[in-house]
UniProtKB/Swiss-Prot annotation:
It comes from the Bacteria. The lineage of its organism: Bacteria, Pseudomonadati, Myxococcota, Myxococcia, Myxococcales. Signal peptide: none annotated. It comes from Anaeromyxobacter sp. (strain Fw109-5). NCBIfam families: S18. Binds as a heterodimer with protein bS6 to the central domain of the 16S rRNA, where it helps stabilize the platform of the 30S subunit. This is Small ribosomal subunit protein bS18.
């Protein structure tokens, strides 16, 4: 027996798959059929449901240049541990670990910190070790 809240044969909502017409927003994972468009609802599909009319901004290929709107400024970030082989990830070095935490105590992602994948994993492990030993905070402040 199909439950009415789980996207059964007679249900239009629920958890359904990409083509079932279910989905959180009513249109599967972004199929756009039925209600909204994917998880975010509204729009023309996709996870955020932000497709459809782009208004005054235009599409990426209309912004000029061969790159399709990519911005060409800024320097490529280099992993500081790969650049300087003498540096090691050390959970006991609080002054080094502060560069990889926000003010609230969250680990900074590698697209911002510039770490390579290998060293970002080491940094995350070191931060978690430091948190367990009360060297680094789990969170700062409160509500």
């Amino acid at each position: 027996m199909a439950r009415p809240d789980m996207g059964g044969p007679k249900s239009s909502g629920g958890f359904g798959g990409p083509r079932s017409g279910g989905g959180f927003g009513g249109g599967g994972y972004g199929g756009g059929g039925g209600g909204g468009g994917g998880y975010g609802g509204g729009g023309g599909g996709g996870f955020g449901g932000r497709g459809g009319d782009r208004g005054d901004r235009g599409d990426r290929d209309d912004r000029g240049g061969e790159e399709g709107g990519r911005r060409g400024f800024g320097r490529r970030k280099v992993c500081r541990f790969c650049a300087d082989k003498t540096l090691k990830v050390d959970y006991k070095d609080q002054s080094q670990m502060k560069y990889f935490l926000t003010e609230r105590g969250k680990i900074i992602p590698r697209r911002i910190s510039g770490n390579c994948a290998k060293h970002q994993r080491e940094v995350a492990t070191a931060v978690k070790r430091g948190r367990m030993l009360a060297i680094l905070p789990y969170t700062v402040g409160g509500m």
